[in-house]
């Protein structure tokens, strides 16, 4: 559901990272890019709405209303929506996949 929402909202360069066995706080991380602050916010709100509609409880969202980087924590999956330059600066994909090939572009 998350990936289809990201695709519908025209999020760019979406990558999924398998965190199982690496992290106690989540099983998967999804990293994606929005073209502007407004796009980042719209993408994040659309994903959060979809999670709520499917019955996910306890969703936490950080980064609104600034929308440089919005994090959606749904428990098993964490979604990061970045503006391009912010994503490049933090480079989470490198941080979490440095020694393995667990990042997959979708």
Regions found by a protein language model. Name each.
Residues 31-33:
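Short hydrophobic/aromatic beta-strand micro-patches
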Residues 1-21, 38-42, 49, 54, ...:
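Long, contiguous binding/interaction regions
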Residues 28, 68-70:
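Short beta-strand micro-motifs in enzyme catalytic cores
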Residues 72-74:
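Active-site beta-strand termini and strand-to-loop segments that position acidic
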Residues 20, 26-29:
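Short beta-strand segments
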């Amino acid at each position: 559901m998350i990936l289809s929402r990201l695709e519908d909202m025209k999020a760019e360069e979406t990558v999924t990272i398998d965190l199982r066995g690496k992290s106690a706080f989540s099983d998967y991380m999804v990293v994606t890019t929005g073209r502007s602050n407004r796009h980042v916010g719209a993408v994040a709100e659309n994903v959060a709405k979809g999670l709520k509609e499917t019955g996910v409880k306890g969703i936490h969202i950080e980064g609104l209303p600034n929308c440089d980087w919005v994090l959606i924590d749904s428990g098993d999956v964490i979604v990061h929506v970045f503006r391009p330059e912010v994503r490049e600066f933090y480079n989470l994909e490198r941080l979490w996949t440095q020694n393995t090939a667990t990042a997959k572009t979708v």
